[in-house]
């Protein structure tokens, strides 16, 4: 048997080690749930009635503007930061019409006390970083601190809807394709309030 030269052997071992670590990292990623509803709560925080009210609120916005908005609540994003997870969810769900690219995603990692708003490129002029930050700071964070998650999300949808309605009208189109890459998005940390998981 012919032995490999030491430098080649060391390089091969390093590549195997990197491949194993890369595979382990992907194995640890939180799965993206199927888009079975415009509101998906994997934390059992929202009541059935609260989820229904949010779904109806979002459905009305979509009927009026065509824009597609969804909310995802998870306990934690585990080893992945919420920015990366939010992008994976947005890319998988492909929110937004093909002609308009008008998708918005709200992600809440409850136990991590983090939230994020992903905005498709076509809505960046209406939902700027500053406007999204105000929605997070003024609507979501105060309500979340008081354990009023439904109220915070409803208020956020109202404000996002107001911004979306400022976008130029686009003819209705329901075909779902991969949207243009979104900007980094907005994220924030909220402080634990009563009843909020540590």
Question: Where do the language-model regions lie?
Answer:
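Single-pass alpha-helical transmembrane signal-anchor segments
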Residues: 190-198
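Basic polycationic patches enriched in arginine
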Residues: 10-11, 183, 194
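Bacterial N-terminal signal peptides
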Residues: 11-24
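Folded, non-transmembrane soluble domains that reside on the lumenal/extracytoplasmic side of membranes
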Residues: 26-191
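Bacterial N-terminal signal peptides that target proteins for export
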Residues: 1-13
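Hydrophobic alpha-helical context, especially transmembrane and signal-peptide helices
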Residues: 5-7, 18, 147
